[in-house]
């Protein structure tokens, strides 16, 4: 059988040692590790998953242990031997271990431990095989000293790794000691922290280590981590930039080669001294010439995470750089407010945006994961829209589907592990966002339509007029047609790139064939005027509703179940064109939501009959100190939570509340006071969850009176409803200060002469 001995010399000699090394790393990090080793001037080749082979010198060994940011361990091959798995494998392992002169590796006074990895094709007791290797080492020492070193399985001076498959067995000495990923700076932690060497590997993958074309400055001029946790990406990026040898902190006593017989203490100290000198020099340059340091931004919605980041920066020896960094408590929804001015003045000319969002195990609620990742993409696109800057974006996720929705051009994906969790790193250039409103994109195209020219002309006239107004107000969702012509009874709403068409059920006097022909003509006209494909048009038939029918799911459709994203006044909102009669966004209340937004800063806001919480989102984005959304439907509240997450708003705390309850009962039992209350009830409801029925004309006075008990003395209650024959109870006008604001809340795309809703601003009467 073939045997290979990796270290032939028995004593320290003047000739350089030739070491066969295995450099281990987490699965998936082989390429970044190889990139790093190449930068050290060390050639390597892939041996297997998570293992790179290196033939090097003692200096190479020390360099890897001292400087590698990606490696986990450095193992030195002691001996390799072919085996026959059909025979006694444990005894073959004993023979292999017995053929090694262990006294050349460590002394009698030092402790050791055995680790064994057995291929599943090999039938052997792992515990017994480890015992036989230990026996061989003990026998070797007994033959020389008549004594043996002790075993310490928890904290040994030397760890011996053995691997065996059906053809070969190998013995390694762990010269790295404790895992190389431990930097020593993590004195404060947050939930599910990112491993240090994984963070470094991802920074390598994204190109953080690269220089510009001239080679005299970093390739990236900034690093942004919008959800920085305990600051691992930030710290690793700074350590990389400042030429810090990550093994320095371990140099005191934690490397496995310190008691090794071939350790060259003088060479090691020389390399330590050089590393410390390089780090001090880099820090000095960064402090004296701040422009040489890339801009570093670390944000998190959790102030505890920011405190942890600052503590870890200090522990990493980077305290002198703290004044040069922007580390602050900032929620994701506030990110674009900071980035846009920096992009505009050119300070973010080539940034790397890299982050580890609270995916899966960190977030807990799977329903919030997709909106969170979508929000990151949308917010960043908005921040860099129209700037000509193409930032690099790198994001981790626990499932590849989560990062599939990110707007990245020619994306690359790295499958790796953060501890025991499989994660995916998606990185590439951010696809630039679009400026301006979306309505202006619609351009007419010629389609042969035999009849229906009157409809086409009216639709074109409406669109031409409304596009100008939409551009002026930066509006993307509008109603362009509402049964303007008697033969074409449809309502057409534009949501960004999509048309939502509602056909009013024709009267019985119109033959079905005639109604169908007219509707098909309308669809052809829509395609011609808007220049869109059939897939961008969603159709519903609107008949008189009873009870909660408008909130019930509709019949089967090929496009059912898909959510689209609408933009409105700085907010992103999910809409569904297929599953319900309504889309989740009442565009006739656009001005009302803007009114609530304008008055919500530092206010407590209550949204009753909240539906999908669109008004709540606007209040939260405006800086409301608390927003409570109450609705009878948990499904719609869940939709509302996703709207919050889509805008980077954290729903896990107490700031934003979502309450599924009977509105009348809730405002009767709840005693909290609110600065702003918004009520937009249905015209009629007889839900099984509701106690009795609700009729807005009959019950609005009682509803408003109860709600006013929850309104602060100087607060505002906004009341709106869509009942066309609604009349406000006169007793309310006698009791409160009420202003009809209908004309101010009806948008430019609705007929003010036939208001689709009525709205009122209600306050407590002030004592004179």
Swiss-Prot record:
UniProt-annotated location(s): Cytoplasm
Cellular component aspect of the GO annotation: cytoplasm
UniProt keywords, alphabetically: Cytoplasm, Methyltransferase, RNA-binding, rRNA processing, S-adenosyl-L-methionine, Transferase
Top-level division of the source organism's lineage: Bacteria
Similarity comment: Belongs to the methyltransferase superfamily. RlmKL family.
Native organism taxonomy: Bacteria, Pseudomonadati, Pseudomonadota, Gammaproteobacteria, Moraxellales
Enzymatic reactions: guanosine(2445) in 23S rRNA + S-adenosyl-L-methionine = N(2)-methylguanosine(2445) in 23S rRNA + S-adenosyl-L-homocysteine + H(+); guanosine(2069) in 23S rRNA + S-adenosyl-L-methionine = N(2)-methylguanosine(2069) in 23S rRNA + S-adenosyl-L-homocysteine + H(+)
Enzyme superclass (EC): transferase
Gene assigned in the entry: rlmL
Official protein name in the record: Ribosomal RNA large subunit methyltransferase K/L
PROSITE patterns assigned: THUMP (PS51165), UPF0020 (PS01261)
Signal sequence segment: none
């Amino acid at each position: 059988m073939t045997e290979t001995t990796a270290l032939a010399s028995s004593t320290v000699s003047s000739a350089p040692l030739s070491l066969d090394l295995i450099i281990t790393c987490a699965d998936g990090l082989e390429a970044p590790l190889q990139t790093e080793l190449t930068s050290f001037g060390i050639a390597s080749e892939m041996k297997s998953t998570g293992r790179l082979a290196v033939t090097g010198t003692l200096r190479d060994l020390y360099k890897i242990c001292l400087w590698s940011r990606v490696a986990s361990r450095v193992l030195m091959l002691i001996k390799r031997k072919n085996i026959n798995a059909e025979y006694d494998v444990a005894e073959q392992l004993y023979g292999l271990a017995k053929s090694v002169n262990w006294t050349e590796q460590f002394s009698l006074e030092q402790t050791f431990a055995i680790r064994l990895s057995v291929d599943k094709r090999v039938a052997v007791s792992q515990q017994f095989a480890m015992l036989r290797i230990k026996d061989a080492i003990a026998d070797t020492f007994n033959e020389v000293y008549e004594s043996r070193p002790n075993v310490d399985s928890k904290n040994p001076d030397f760890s011996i790794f053995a691997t065996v498959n059906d053809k070969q067995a190998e013995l390694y000495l762990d010269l790295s000691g404790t895992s190389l990923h431990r930097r020593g700076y993590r004195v404060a932690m947050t939930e599910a922290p990112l491993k240090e060497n994984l963070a470094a590997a991802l920074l390598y993958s994204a190109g953080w280590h690269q220089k510009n074309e001239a080679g005299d400055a970093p390739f990236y001029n900034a690093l942004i981590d919008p959800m920085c946790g305990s600051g691992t990406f930030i710290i690793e990026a700074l350590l990389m930039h400042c030429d810090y040898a990550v093994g320095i902190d371990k140099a005191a006593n934690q490397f496995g080669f310190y008691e090794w017989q071939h350790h060259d203490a003088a060479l090691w100290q020389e390399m330590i001294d050089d590393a410390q000198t390089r780090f001090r020099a880099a820090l000095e340059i960064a402090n004296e010439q701040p422009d040489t340091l890339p801009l570093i931004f670390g944000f998190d919605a959790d102030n505890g995470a920011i405190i942890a980041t600052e503590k870890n920066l200090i522990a990493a020896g980077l305290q002198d750089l703290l004044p040069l960094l922007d580390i602050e408590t900032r929620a994701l929804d506030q990110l674009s407010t900071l980035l846009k001015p920096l992009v505009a003045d050119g300070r973010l000319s080539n940034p790397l945006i890299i982050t580890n969002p609270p995916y899966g195990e960190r977030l807990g609620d799977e329903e919030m994961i997709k909106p969170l990742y979508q929000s990151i993409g949308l917010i960043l696109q908005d921040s860099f829209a129209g700037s000509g800057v193409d930032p690099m974006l790198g994001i981790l996720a626990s499932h590849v589907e989560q990062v599939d929705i990110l707007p990245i051009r020619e994306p690359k994906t790295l499958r790796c592990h953060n501890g025991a969790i499989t994660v995916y790193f998606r990185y590439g250039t951010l696809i630039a966002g679009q400026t301006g409103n979306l309505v202006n994109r619609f351009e007419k195209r010629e389609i042969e339509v035999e009849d229906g020219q009157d409809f086409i002309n009216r639709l074109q006239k409406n669109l031409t007029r409304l596009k100008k107004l939409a551009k002026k107000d930066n509006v993307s969702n509008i109603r362009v047609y509402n049964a303007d012509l008697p033969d074409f009874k449809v309502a057409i709403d534009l949501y960004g790139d999509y048309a939502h068409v509602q056909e009013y059920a024709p009267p019985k006097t119109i033959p079905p064939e005639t109604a169908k022909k007219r509707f098909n003509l309308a669809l052809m006209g829509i395609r011609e005027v808007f220049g869109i494909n059939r897939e961008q048009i969603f159709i519903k038939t609107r008949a008189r509703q009873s009870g909660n029918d408008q909130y019930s799911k509709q019949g089967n459709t090929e496009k059912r179940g898909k959510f689209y994203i609408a933009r409105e006044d700085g907010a992103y909102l999910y809409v569904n064109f297929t599953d319900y009669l309504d889309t989740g966004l009442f565009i006739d209340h656009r001005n009302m939501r803007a009114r609530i937004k304008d008055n919500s800063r530092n206010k407590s806001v209550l949204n009753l009959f909240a539906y999908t919480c669109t008004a709540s989102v606007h209040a939260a984005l405006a800086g409301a100190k608390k927003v409570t959304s109450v609705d009878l439907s948990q499904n719609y509240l869940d939709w509302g939570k996703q709207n919050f997450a889509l805008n980077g708003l954290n729903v896990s705390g107490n700031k934003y509340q979502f309450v599924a309850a009977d509105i009348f009962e809730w405002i009767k039992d709840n005693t909290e006071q609110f600065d702003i209350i918004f009520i937009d009830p249905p015209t009629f409801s007889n839900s099984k969850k509701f106690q009795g029925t609700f009729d807005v004309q009959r019950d609005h006075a009682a509803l408003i009176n109860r709600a006013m008990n929850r309104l602060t003395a100087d607060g505002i209650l906004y009341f709106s409803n869509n009942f066309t024959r609604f009349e406000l109870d006169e007793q309310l006008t006698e009791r409160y200060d009420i202003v009809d604001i209908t004309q101010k809340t009806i948008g430019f795309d609705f007929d003010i002469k036939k208001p689709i809703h009525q709205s009122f601003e209600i306050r407590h009467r002030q004592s004179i």
